Protein backbone atom coordinates (compact mmCIF):
# COMPACT_ATOMS: atom_id res chain seq x y z
CA UNK A 1 0.00 0.00 0.00
CA UNK A 2 2.86 2.38 0.77
CA UNK A 3 4.49 1.83 -2.70
CA UNK A 4 1.37 2.84 -4.57
CA UNK A 5 1.31 6.37 -6.06
CA UNK A 6 -1.70 8.65 -5.70
CA UNK A 7 -4.01 8.86 -8.79
CA UNK A 8 -3.34 12.58 -9.47
CA UNK A 9 0.43 11.90 -9.71
CA UNK A 10 -0.18 9.04 -12.16
CA UNK A 11 -2.35 11.33 -14.35
CA UNK A 12 0.27 14.11 -14.33
CA UNK A 13 3.02 11.64 -15.34
CA UNK A 14 0.87 10.31 -18.21
CA UNK A 15 0.23 13.91 -19.45
CA UNK A 16 3.96 14.74 -19.33
CA UNK A 17 4.79 11.58 -21.33
CA UNK A 18 2.14 12.37 -23.96
CA UNK A 19 3.44 15.97 -24.29
CA UNK A 20 7.00 14.67 -24.77
CA UNK A 21 5.85 12.16 -27.37
CA UNK A 22 3.99 14.97 -29.21
CA UNK A 23 7.08 17.18 -29.14
CA UNK A 24 9.33 14.51 -30.62
CA UNK A 25 6.73 13.46 -33.22
CA UNK A 26 6.51 16.93 -34.84
CA UNK A 27 8.33 17.01 -38.22
CA UNK A 28 7.03 20.23 -39.81
CA UNK A 29 9.27 23.30 -39.98
CA UNK A 30 6.92 25.89 -38.43
CA UNK A 31 7.89 28.60 -35.88
CA UNK A 32 7.13 27.29 -32.38
CA UNK A 33 7.44 23.58 -33.25
CA UNK A 34 10.01 21.35 -31.55
CA UNK A 35 11.98 19.31 -34.09
CA UNK A 36 14.68 16.65 -33.86
CA UNK A 37 17.63 16.93 -36.25
CA UNK A 38 21.27 15.95 -36.71
CA UNK A 39 24.06 18.54 -36.97
CA UNK A 40 25.88 17.86 -40.26
CA UNK A 41 28.10 20.97 -40.44
CA UNK A 42 29.54 23.76 -38.30
CA UNK A 43 29.48 27.44 -39.21
CA UNK A 44 31.02 30.57 -37.74
CA UNK A 45 30.49 31.55 -34.06
CA UNK A 46 29.87 27.91 -32.96
CA UNK A 47 26.63 27.56 -34.97
CA UNK A 48 25.51 24.04 -35.89
CA UNK A 49 23.86 23.50 -39.28
CA UNK A 50 21.42 20.83 -40.45
CA UNK A 51 21.46 21.00 -44.26
CA UNK A 52 19.27 18.30 -45.80
CA UNK A 53 16.44 17.22 -43.45
CA UNK A 54 13.94 20.00 -44.19
CA UNK A 55 15.08 21.23 -47.61
CA UNK A 56 16.62 24.44 -46.22
CA UNK A 57 19.53 24.87 -43.74
CA UNK A 58 18.51 25.02 -40.06
CA UNK A 59 20.94 26.99 -37.83
CA UNK A 60 21.21 25.82 -34.19
CA UNK A 61 23.64 27.86 -32.00
CA UNK A 62 25.82 26.08 -29.39
CA UNK A 63 25.40 22.68 -31.08
CA UNK A 64 28.27 20.33 -31.96
CA UNK A 65 29.06 18.42 -35.12
CA UNK A 66 27.49 14.94 -35.31
CA UNK A 67 25.02 15.48 -32.42
CA UNK A 68 21.32 14.65 -32.67
CA UNK A 69 19.43 17.44 -30.89
CA UNK A 70 15.94 18.68 -30.17
CA UNK A 71 15.43 22.35 -31.08
CA UNK A 72 12.59 24.85 -31.12
CA UNK A 73 12.05 26.72 -34.40
CA UNK A 74 12.28 30.51 -33.83
CA UNK A 75 12.34 32.08 -37.32
CA UNK A 76 12.17 31.10 -40.99
CA UNK A 77 13.88 33.65 -43.24
CA UNK A 78 12.28 33.10 -46.66
CA UNK A 79 14.49 35.69 -48.41
CA UNK A 80 17.74 33.97 -47.32
CA UNK A 81 16.18 30.45 -47.33
CA UNK A 82 17.33 29.53 -43.82
CA UNK A 83 15.68 28.68 -40.50
CA UNK A 84 16.89 29.56 -36.98
CA UNK A 85 16.23 27.23 -34.05
CA UNK A 86 17.02 27.22 -30.30
CA UNK A 87 18.74 24.24 -28.68
CA UNK A 88 16.55 22.48 -26.10
CA UNK A 89 18.10 19.06 -25.55
CA UNK A 90 20.98 16.94 -26.84
CA UNK A 91 19.57 13.48 -27.68
CA UNK A 92 22.79 11.74 -28.78
CA UNK A 93 26.27 13.16 -28.39
CA UNK A 94 29.21 12.76 -30.78
CA UNK A 95 30.93 9.38 -30.79
CA UNK A 96 34.30 10.92 -31.65
CA UNK A 97 37.03 10.02 -29.17
CA UNK A 98 40.16 12.11 -29.01
CA UNK A 99 42.92 9.55 -29.48
CA UNK A 100 45.55 12.28 -29.77
CA UNK A 101 46.14 15.80 -28.51
CA UNK A 102 45.47 17.47 -31.90
CA UNK A 103 43.35 20.65 -32.09
CA UNK A 104 40.02 20.85 -33.91
CA UNK A 105 39.60 23.12 -36.94
CA UNK A 106 36.84 25.72 -36.43
CA UNK A 107 35.15 28.17 -38.85
CA UNK A 108 36.81 31.59 -38.99
CA UNK A 109 40.38 30.24 -38.87
CA UNK A 110 42.88 31.31 -41.55
CA UNK A 111 45.30 28.79 -43.05
CA UNK A 112 48.15 28.88 -45.57
CA UNK A 113 47.67 25.79 -47.74
CA UNK A 114 48.90 24.33 -51.04
CA UNK A 115 46.41 23.09 -53.64
CA UNK A 116 46.99 19.40 -54.42
CA UNK A 117 43.93 18.60 -56.52
CA UNK A 118 41.35 20.47 -58.63
CA UNK A 119 37.58 20.15 -58.17
CA UNK A 120 34.49 21.30 -60.08
CA UNK A 121 33.23 24.92 -60.35
CA UNK A 122 36.60 26.69 -59.75
CA UNK A 123 37.46 24.79 -56.56
CA UNK A 124 40.69 23.28 -55.30
CA UNK A 125 41.38 20.60 -52.67
CA UNK A 126 44.19 20.95 -50.12
CA UNK A 127 45.40 18.01 -47.99
CA UNK A 128 45.75 18.97 -44.31
CA UNK A 129 47.25 15.62 -43.25
CA UNK A 130 47.09 14.81 -39.53
CA UNK A 131 47.23 18.42 -38.31
CA UNK A 132 43.62 18.41 -37.01
CA UNK A 133 41.55 15.72 -35.31
CA UNK A 134 38.29 16.44 -37.19
CA UNK A 135 39.36 17.45 -40.75
CA UNK A 136 41.71 15.91 -43.33
CA UNK A 137 40.85 17.94 -46.47
CA UNK A 138 40.01 21.56 -47.23
CA UNK A 139 37.93 22.59 -50.29
CA UNK A 140 38.89 26.11 -51.45
CA UNK A 141 36.77 28.34 -53.74
CA UNK A 142 38.85 30.56 -56.04
CA UNK A 143 38.64 31.50 -59.72
CA UNK A 144 41.43 30.24 -62.01
CA UNK A 145 42.96 28.08 -59.29
CA UNK A 146 45.94 25.85 -60.20
CA UNK A 147 47.66 22.81 -58.68
CA UNK A 148 50.61 23.74 -56.45
CA UNK A 149 49.31 27.28 -55.80
CA UNK A 150 49.81 28.58 -52.26
CA UNK A 151 46.70 30.31 -50.95
CA UNK A 152 45.63 32.00 -47.71
CA UNK A 153 42.22 30.53 -46.88
CA UNK A 154 39.44 31.64 -44.53
CA UNK A 155 37.51 28.59 -43.23
CA UNK A 156 33.74 29.15 -43.60
CA UNK A 157 32.20 25.72 -42.85
CA UNK A 158 33.39 22.50 -41.21
CA UNK A 159 31.93 19.01 -41.85
CA UNK A 160 32.82 15.48 -40.77
CA UNK A 161 36.25 14.86 -42.31
CA UNK A 162 36.48 17.95 -44.56
CA UNK A 163 35.95 21.73 -44.53
CA UNK A 164 35.13 24.60 -46.92
CA UNK A 165 37.05 27.85 -47.29
CA UNK A 166 37.47 31.00 -49.37
CA UNK A 167 40.72 32.46 -50.72
CA UNK A 168 41.69 35.74 -49.03
CA UNK A 169 44.57 38.22 -49.13
CA UNK A 170 46.61 39.04 -46.04
CA UNK A 171 47.21 42.63 -44.89
CA UNK A 172 50.99 42.27 -45.44
CA UNK A 173 50.44 41.44 -49.11
CA UNK A 174 48.00 44.32 -49.44
CA UNK A 175 50.53 46.78 -48.01
CA UNK A 176 53.38 45.33 -50.15
CA UNK A 177 51.36 45.65 -53.36
CA UNK A 178 49.93 49.07 -52.49
CA UNK A 179 53.38 50.57 -51.78
CA UNK A 180 54.74 49.29 -55.11
CA UNK A 181 52.02 51.07 -57.12
CA UNK A 182 52.87 54.18 -59.14
CA UNK A 183 50.88 57.34 -59.83
CA UNK A 184 49.84 56.16 -63.30
CA UNK A 185 48.42 52.90 -61.92
CA UNK A 186 45.99 54.86 -59.70
CA UNK A 187 44.95 57.46 -62.26
CA UNK A 188 41.54 56.54 -63.69
CA UNK A 189 40.81 53.71 -61.23
CA UNK A 190 37.25 53.46 -59.88
CA UNK A 191 36.07 52.56 -56.38
CA UNK A 192 32.66 52.15 -54.77
CA UNK A 193 32.79 54.01 -51.45
CA UNK A 194 30.58 55.25 -48.63
CA UNK A 195 31.30 58.90 -47.78
CA UNK A 196 32.05 59.00 -44.01
CA UNK A 197 29.70 61.13 -41.92
CA UNK A 198 32.65 62.55 -39.94
CA UNK A 199 34.47 63.77 -43.10
CA UNK A 200 35.78 67.35 -43.02
CA UNK A 201 35.31 70.03 -45.68
CA UNK A 202 38.16 71.93 -47.32
CA UNK A 203 36.97 74.55 -49.83
CA UNK A 204 34.83 72.54 -52.31
CA UNK A 205 36.11 69.07 -51.33
CA UNK A 206 35.35 66.45 -48.70
CA UNK A 207 38.56 65.31 -46.97
CA UNK A 208 38.99 62.02 -45.10
CA UNK A 209 41.86 59.66 -44.37
CA UNK A 210 41.96 56.03 -45.50
CA UNK A 211 42.04 53.65 -42.53
CA UNK A 212 43.82 50.28 -42.41
CA UNK A 213 42.76 48.14 -45.35
CA UNK A 214 41.91 44.89 -43.55
CA UNK A 215 40.41 41.84 -45.22
CA UNK A 216 36.75 41.41 -44.37
CA UNK A 217 34.89 38.16 -43.67
CA UNK A 218 33.80 36.71 -47.01
CA UNK A 219 30.51 34.94 -47.63
CA UNK A 220 30.39 31.49 -49.18
CA UNK A 221 28.52 32.66 -52.29
CA UNK A 222 30.30 35.95 -53.03
CA UNK A 223 34.04 35.88 -53.64
CA UNK A 224 34.69 39.50 -54.65
CA UNK A 225 36.43 41.28 -51.78
CA UNK A 226 35.64 44.98 -51.36
CA UNK A 227 38.10 46.63 -48.98
CA UNK A 228 36.33 49.99 -48.65
CA UNK A 229 34.00 50.15 -45.69
CA UNK A 230 33.82 52.90 -43.07
CA UNK A 231 36.85 54.65 -44.58
CA UNK A 232 38.84 51.69 -45.93
CA UNK A 233 39.42 51.92 -49.68
CA UNK A 234 40.37 49.23 -52.18
CA UNK A 235 39.14 46.39 -54.34
CA UNK A 236 40.80 42.97 -54.43
CA UNK A 237 40.71 42.17 -58.13
CA UNK A 238 43.24 39.37 -57.66
CA UNK A 239 40.59 36.91 -56.43
CA UNK A 240 38.49 37.22 -59.57
CA UNK A 241 41.46 37.54 -61.91
CA UNK A 242 42.17 34.66 -64.27
CA UNK A 243 45.94 34.73 -63.78
CA UNK A 244 45.64 35.11 -60.02
CA UNK A 245 48.78 37.28 -59.76
CA UNK A 246 49.13 39.81 -56.98
CA UNK A 247 50.35 42.43 -59.44
CA UNK A 248 46.80 43.17 -60.56
CA UNK A 249 45.66 44.11 -57.02
CA UNK A 250 44.72 47.80 -56.85
CA UNK A 251 44.32 49.18 -53.33
CA UNK A 252 44.84 52.63 -51.90
CA UNK A 253 47.64 52.73 -49.25
CA UNK A 254 46.62 53.17 -45.63
CA UNK A 255 48.28 56.60 -45.25
CA UNK A 256 46.29 58.20 -48.11
CA UNK A 257 44.23 61.40 -47.80
CA UNK A 258 41.29 61.54 -50.21
CA UNK A 259 39.86 64.79 -51.62
CA UNK A 260 36.39 64.13 -53.08
CA UNK A 261 34.30 66.85 -54.74
CA UNK A 262 30.62 66.31 -53.71
CA UNK A 263 28.76 66.68 -57.02
CA UNK A 264 25.61 64.92 -58.35
CA UNK A 265 23.83 65.86 -55.11
CA UNK A 266 25.90 63.46 -52.98
CA UNK A 267 25.72 63.83 -49.18
CA UNK A 268 27.69 62.45 -46.24
CA UNK A 269 26.81 58.81 -45.66
CA UNK A 270 25.80 58.15 -49.29
CA UNK A 271 27.19 55.28 -51.32
CA UNK A 272 28.97 56.62 -54.44
CA UNK A 273 31.34 55.50 -57.18
CA UNK A 274 34.49 57.65 -57.44
CA UNK A 275 37.30 57.89 -60.00
CA UNK A 276 40.87 58.91 -59.09
CA UNK A 277 41.92 61.99 -61.11
CA UNK A 278 45.30 62.75 -59.51
CA UNK A 279 47.58 60.85 -57.15
CA UNK A 280 50.76 62.15 -55.53
CA UNK A 281 53.06 61.18 -52.64
CA UNK A 282 54.51 63.78 -50.23
CA UNK A 283 57.61 63.04 -48.11
CA UNK A 284 58.17 64.84 -44.81
CA UNK A 285 61.37 63.46 -43.37
CA UNK A 286 60.75 59.83 -42.49
CA UNK A 287 56.97 60.09 -42.99
CA UNK A 288 55.34 59.75 -46.41
CA UNK A 289 51.78 60.84 -47.20
CA UNK A 290 49.79 59.96 -50.29
CA UNK A 291 47.21 62.46 -51.59
CA UNK A 292 44.47 61.44 -54.04
CA UNK A 293 41.90 63.70 -55.73
CA UNK A 294 38.75 61.96 -56.94
CA UNK A 295 35.46 62.87 -58.57
CA UNK A 296 32.05 61.26 -58.08
CA UNK A 297 30.91 59.39 -61.21
CA UNK A 298 27.74 57.73 -60.01
CA UNK A 299 25.38 58.15 -57.07
CA UNK A 300 24.10 55.00 -55.33
CA UNK A 301 25.59 52.51 -57.84
CA UNK A 302 23.67 49.29 -58.29
CA UNK A 303 25.02 46.08 -56.82
CA UNK A 304 25.52 42.99 -58.99
CA UNK A 305 22.21 41.31 -57.96
CA UNK A 306 20.33 44.58 -58.58
CA UNK A 307 21.96 44.92 -62.02
CA UNK A 308 20.99 41.33 -62.88
CA UNK A 309 17.39 41.94 -61.77
CA UNK A 310 17.26 45.15 -63.85
CA UNK A 311 18.60 43.31 -66.93
CA UNK A 312 16.06 40.50 -66.46
CA UNK A 313 13.13 42.94 -66.20
CA UNK A 314 14.25 44.84 -69.32
CA UNK A 315 14.62 41.54 -71.24
CA UNK A 316 11.11 40.51 -70.17
CA UNK A 317 9.72 43.82 -71.48
CA UNK A 318 11.59 43.33 -74.77
CA UNK A 319 10.19 39.79 -75.10
CA UNK A 320 6.64 41.01 -74.40
CA UNK A 321 6.92 43.69 -77.08
CA UNK A 322 8.25 41.08 -79.59
CA UNK A 323 11.66 42.62 -80.20
CA UNK A 324 13.24 39.15 -80.62
CA UNK A 325 11.36 38.49 -83.88
CA UNK A 326 13.48 39.38 -86.89
CA UNK A 327 12.70 39.67 -90.57
CA UNK A 328 12.26 36.65 -92.81
CA UNK A 329 15.37 34.48 -93.13
CA UNK A 330 15.49 35.13 -96.89
CA UNK A 331 15.75 38.92 -96.35
CA UNK A 332 18.41 38.66 -93.60
CA UNK A 333 21.50 40.80 -94.18
CA UNK A 334 24.89 39.08 -93.89
CA UNK A 335 26.11 41.63 -91.33
CA UNK A 336 23.21 40.77 -88.99
CA UNK A 337 24.40 37.18 -88.46
CA UNK A 338 26.46 38.26 -85.47
CA UNK A 339 23.32 39.59 -83.73
CA UNK A 340 21.10 36.52 -84.33
CA UNK A 341 20.80 33.39 -82.20
CA UNK A 342 22.73 30.48 -83.72
CA UNK A 343 22.92 26.75 -83.04
CA UNK A 344 25.64 24.21 -83.72
CA UNK A 345 25.33 20.44 -84.17
CA UNK A 346 28.12 18.43 -82.57
CA UNK A 347 31.43 19.57 -81.11
CA UNK A 348 33.41 19.75 -84.34
CA UNK A 349 35.09 23.16 -84.76
CA UNK A 350 34.92 22.95 -88.55
CA UNK A 351 31.11 22.87 -88.56
CA UNK A 352 29.72 26.41 -88.80
CA UNK A 353 26.95 27.55 -86.48
CA UNK A 354 23.68 28.13 -88.33
CA UNK A 355 21.11 30.78 -87.40
CA UNK A 356 18.13 29.62 -85.33
CA UNK A 357 14.95 29.97 -87.41
CA UNK A 358 11.35 29.69 -86.19
CA UNK A 359 8.36 30.08 -88.51
CA UNK A 360 10.69 31.28 -91.26
CA UNK A 361 12.07 34.17 -89.14
CA UNK A 362 15.38 34.72 -87.37
CA UNK A 363 15.49 35.17 -83.58
CA UNK A 364 17.45 38.26 -82.52
CA UNK A 365 19.82 38.06 -79.53
CA UNK A 366 18.21 40.49 -77.07
CA UNK A 367 21.31 40.69 -74.86
CA UNK A 368 23.31 42.17 -77.76
CA UNK A 369 20.44 44.49 -78.74
CA UNK A 370 20.27 45.76 -75.15
CA UNK A 371 24.02 46.49 -75.19
CA UNK A 372 23.74 48.31 -78.52
CA UNK A 373 20.74 50.31 -77.26
CA UNK A 374 22.64 51.42 -74.15
CA UNK A 375 25.57 52.54 -76.33
CA UNK A 376 23.20 54.42 -78.64
CA UNK A 377 21.49 56.05 -75.65
CA UNK A 378 24.83 57.23 -74.27
CA UNK A 379 25.75 58.74 -77.66
CA UNK A 380 22.34 60.40 -78.03
CA UNK A 381 22.57 61.95 -74.56
CA UNK A 382 25.89 63.54 -75.56
CA UNK A 383 24.35 65.10 -78.68
CA UNK A 384 21.20 66.15 -76.79
CA UNK A 385 23.33 67.89 -74.15
CA UNK A 386 24.97 69.89 -76.96
CA UNK A 387 21.53 70.97 -78.25
CA UNK A 388 21.58 69.08 -81.56
CA UNK A 389 18.42 68.38 -83.59
CA UNK A 390 17.26 64.83 -84.41
CA UNK A 391 15.30 63.10 -87.18
CA UNK A 392 13.08 60.18 -86.09
CA UNK A 393 12.17 57.68 -88.84
CA UNK A 394 9.67 54.82 -88.49
CA UNK A 395 7.34 53.92 -91.36
CA UNK A 396 5.83 50.69 -89.94
CA UNK A 397 2.40 50.78 -88.32
CA UNK A 398 3.70 49.68 -84.93
CA UNK A 399 6.44 52.35 -84.86
CA UNK A 400 4.72 55.30 -86.58
CA UNK A 401 2.78 56.47 -83.52
CA UNK A 402 5.75 56.04 -81.16
CA UNK A 403 8.06 57.94 -83.52
CA UNK A 404 5.66 60.88 -83.80
CA UNK A 405 5.12 60.97 -80.02
CA UNK A 406 8.86 60.88 -79.25
CA UNK A 407 9.62 63.65 -81.76
CA UNK A 408 6.83 65.89 -80.48
CA UNK A 409 7.87 65.25 -76.88
CA UNK A 410 11.45 66.36 -77.57
CA UNK A 411 10.19 69.64 -79.19
CA UNK A 412 13.43 70.01 -81.21
CA UNK A 413 13.14 67.03 -83.54
CA UNK A 414 11.60 66.11 -86.90
CA UNK A 415 10.01 62.80 -87.85
CA UNK A 416 9.00 60.73 -90.90
CA UNK A 417 6.38 58.06 -90.13
CA UNK A 418 4.42 57.56 -93.40
CA UNK A 419 6.73 56.96 -96.39
CA UNK A 420 10.46 57.39 -96.76
CA UNK A 421 11.46 58.95 -100.05
CA UNK A 422 14.59 57.42 -101.52
CA UNK A 423 17.55 59.79 -101.40
CA UNK A 424 16.07 62.14 -98.80
CA UNK A 425 19.45 62.37 -97.09
CA UNK A 426 21.87 61.33 -99.85
CA UNK A 427 20.25 63.06 -102.85
CA UNK A 428 18.59 66.12 -101.33
CA UNK A 429 19.06 68.37 -104.39
CA UNK A 430 16.77 66.33 -106.67
CA UNK A 431 14.15 66.01 -103.93
CA UNK A 432 14.19 69.81 -103.53
CA UNK A 433 13.45 70.14 -107.26
CA UNK A 434 10.47 67.78 -106.99
CA UNK A 435 9.23 69.69 -103.92
CA UNK A 436 9.49 72.97 -105.87
CA UNK A 437 7.24 71.45 -108.59
CA UNK A 438 4.67 70.18 -106.09
CA UNK A 439 4.49 73.46 -104.13
CA UNK A 440 2.40 75.43 -106.73
CA UNK A 441 -0.09 72.53 -106.97
CA UNK A 442 -0.46 72.53 -103.20
CA UNK A 443 -0.92 76.32 -103.19
CA UNK A 444 -3.72 76.06 -105.78
CA UNK A 445 -5.40 73.38 -103.71
CA UNK A 446 -5.17 75.53 -100.61
CA UNK A 447 -6.68 78.53 -102.46
CA UNK A 448 -9.63 76.43 -103.71
CA UNK A 449 -10.30 75.06 -100.24
CA UNK A 450 -10.08 78.58 -98.82
CA UNK A 451 -12.67 79.90 -101.36
CA UNK A 452 -15.05 77.03 -100.57
CA UNK A 453 -14.77 77.69 -96.85
CA UNK A 454 -15.39 81.44 -97.32
CA UNK A 455 -18.51 80.77 -99.44
CA UNK A 456 -19.80 78.36 -96.84
CA UNK A 457 -19.35 80.94 -94.11
CA UNK A 458 -21.19 83.67 -96.10
CA UNK A 459 -24.13 81.33 -96.88
CA UNK A 460 -24.27 80.31 -93.24
CA UNK A 461 -24.32 83.96 -92.11
CA UNK A 462 -27.16 84.83 -94.55
CA UNK A 463 -29.27 81.89 -93.43
CA UNK A 464 -28.77 82.83 -89.79
CA UNK A 465 -29.86 86.45 -90.49
CA UNK A 466 -33.02 85.30 -92.32
CA UNK A 467 -33.85 82.89 -89.51
CA UNK A 468 -33.55 85.73 -87.00
CA UNK A 469 -35.85 87.97 -89.09
CA UNK A 470 -38.46 85.21 -89.31
CA UNK A 471 -38.26 84.77 -85.57
CA UNK A 472 -38.88 88.50 -84.99
CA UNK A 473 -41.84 88.50 -87.40
CA UNK A 474 -43.35 85.46 -85.71
CA UNK A 475 -43.07 87.22 -82.35
CA UNK A 476 -44.89 90.29 -83.75
CA UNK A 477 -47.63 88.07 -85.18
CA UNK A 478 -48.10 86.43 -81.80
CA UNK A 479 -48.42 89.83 -80.13
CA UNK A 480 -51.07 90.95 -82.66
CA UNK A 481 -52.98 87.70 -82.18
CA UNK A 482 -53.05 88.22 -78.43
CA UNK A 483 -54.33 91.79 -78.89
CA UNK A 484 -57.12 90.54 -81.18
CA UNK A 485 -58.14 87.91 -78.64
CA UNK A 486 -58.35 90.60 -75.95
CA UNK A 487 -60.42 92.85 -78.22
CA UNK A 488 -62.80 89.97 -78.95
CA UNK A 489 -63.23 89.28 -75.27
CA UNK A 490 -64.01 92.97 -74.64
CA UNK A 491 -66.48 93.17 -77.55
CA UNK A 492 -68.39 90.03 -76.47
CA UNK A 493 -70.54 92.23 -74.27
CA UNK A 494 -71.40 94.53 -77.24
CA UNK A 495 -74.17 94.02 -79.77
CA UNK A 496 -74.35 91.29 -82.37
CA UNK A 497 -73.67 93.82 -85.11
CA UNK A 498 -70.39 94.63 -83.49
CA UNK A 499 -69.61 90.93 -83.31
CA UNK A 500 -70.22 90.50 -87.02
CA UNK A 501 -67.94 93.45 -87.80
CA UNK A 502 -65.21 91.99 -85.64
CA UNK A 503 -65.58 88.62 -87.33
CA UNK A 504 -65.28 90.27 -90.72
CA UNK A 505 -62.10 92.06 -89.65
CA UNK A 506 -60.72 88.83 -88.19
CA UNK A 507 -61.32 86.91 -91.42
CA UNK A 508 -59.64 89.65 -93.46
CA UNK A 509 -56.58 89.61 -91.21
CA UNK A 510 -56.36 85.82 -91.27
CA UNK A 511 -56.45 85.93 -95.05
CA UNK A 512 -53.62 88.45 -95.07
CA UNK A 513 -51.64 86.28 -92.69
CA UNK A 514 -52.14 83.21 -94.88
CA UNK A 515 -50.95 85.08 -97.97
CA UNK A 516 -47.85 86.29 -96.15
CA UNK A 517 -47.21 82.77 -94.84
CA UNK A 518 -47.37 81.40 -98.39
CA UNK A 519 -44.90 84.07 -99.54
CA UNK A 520 -42.46 83.10 -96.75
CA UNK A 521 -42.81 79.40 -97.59
CA UNK A 522 -42.05 80.10 -101.26
CA UNK A 523 -38.99 82.14 -100.26
CA UNK A 524 -37.82 79.28 -98.02
CA UNK A 525 -38.18 76.82 -100.91
CA UNK A 526 -36.09 79.12 -103.11
CA UNK A 527 -33.40 79.29 -100.42
CA UNK A 528 -33.33 75.49 -100.15
CA UNK A 529 -32.93 75.21 -103.94
CA UNK A 530 -30.03 77.66 -103.82
CA UNK A 531 -28.47 75.61 -101.01
CA UNK A 532 -28.73 72.42 -103.09
CA UNK A 533 -27.07 74.21 -106.01
CA UNK A 534 -24.23 75.28 -103.72
CA UNK A 535 -23.83 71.70 -102.46
CA UNK A 536 -23.54 70.48 -106.07
CA UNK A 537 -20.91 73.14 -106.76
CA UNK A 538 -19.03 72.04 -103.63
CA UNK A 539 -18.97 68.43 -104.84
CA UNK A 540 -17.65 69.60 -108.21
CA UNK A 541 -14.87 71.50 -106.44
CA UNK A 542 -13.99 68.39 -104.40
CA UNK A 543 -13.73 66.30 -107.57
CA UNK A 544 -11.50 68.98 -109.10
CA UNK A 545 -9.24 68.91 -106.02
CA UNK A 546 -9.04 65.10 -106.22
CA UNK A 547 -8.02 65.27 -109.87
CA UNK A 548 -5.35 67.82 -108.97
CA UNK A 549 -4.14 65.49 -106.23
CA UNK A 550 -3.91 62.52 -108.62
CA UNK A 551 -1.96 64.71 -111.05
CA UNK A 552 0.44 65.62 -108.24
CA UNK A 553 0.95 61.92 -107.40
CA UNK A 554 1.60 61.15 -111.07
CA UNK A 555 4.15 63.96 -111.18
CA UNK A 556 5.93 62.56 -108.10
CA UNK A 557 5.97 59.07 -109.63
CA UNK A 558 7.44 60.38 -112.89
CA UNK A 559 10.06 62.32 -110.91
CA UNK A 560 11.01 59.20 -108.94
CA UNK A 561 11.25 57.16 -112.17
CA UNK A 562 13.39 59.87 -113.71
CA UNK A 563 15.68 59.80 -110.65
CA UNK A 564 16.00 56.01 -110.85
CA UNK A 565 16.86 56.19 -114.55
CA UNK A 566 19.34 58.95 -113.86
CA UNK A 567 20.96 56.84 -111.11
CA UNK A 568 21.15 53.86 -113.47
CA UNK A 569 22.88 55.94 -116.16
CA UNK A 570 25.31 57.48 -113.64
UniProtKB/Swiss-Prot annotation:
InterPro entries attached to this UniProt entry: NA-bd_OB-fold, Ribosomal_uS2, Ribosomal_uS2_bac/mit/plastid, Ribosomal_uS2_flav_dom_sf, TRAM_dom
The protein's name: Small ribosomal subunit protein uS2c
GO molecular function: structural constituent of ribosome
Keywords associated with the record: Chloroplast, Plastid, Repeat, Ribonucleoprotein, Ribosomal protein
Family of the protein in this entry: Belongs to the universal ribosomal protein uS2 family.
Domain TRAM: 28-89, 104-169
Subcellular location: Plastid, Chloroplast
GO CC annotation: chloroplast; mitochondrial small ribosomal subunit
Protein encoded by which gene: rps2-1
NCBIfam families found in the cross-reference section: rpsB_bact
Gene Ontology process terms (BP): translation
Amino acid sequence: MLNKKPPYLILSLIMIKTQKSKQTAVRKLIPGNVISLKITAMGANNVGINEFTFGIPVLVPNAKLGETVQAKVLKILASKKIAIAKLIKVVTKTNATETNNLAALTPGATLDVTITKLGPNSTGIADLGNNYNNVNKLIVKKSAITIGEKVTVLVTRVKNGYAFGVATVSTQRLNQVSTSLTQNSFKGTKFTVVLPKNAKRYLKHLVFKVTTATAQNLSVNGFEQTLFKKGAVGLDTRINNQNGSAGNLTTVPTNTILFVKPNLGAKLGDKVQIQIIKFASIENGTLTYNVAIAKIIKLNPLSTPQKKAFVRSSLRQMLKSGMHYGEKAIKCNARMKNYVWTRKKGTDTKVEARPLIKKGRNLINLLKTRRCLTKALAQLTKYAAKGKTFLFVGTKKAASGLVARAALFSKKAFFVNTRWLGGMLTNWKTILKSISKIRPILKEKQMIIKDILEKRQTIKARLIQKALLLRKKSKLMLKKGRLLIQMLKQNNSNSTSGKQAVRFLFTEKTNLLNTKRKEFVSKGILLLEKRQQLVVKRQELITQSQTLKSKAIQLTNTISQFIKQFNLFT
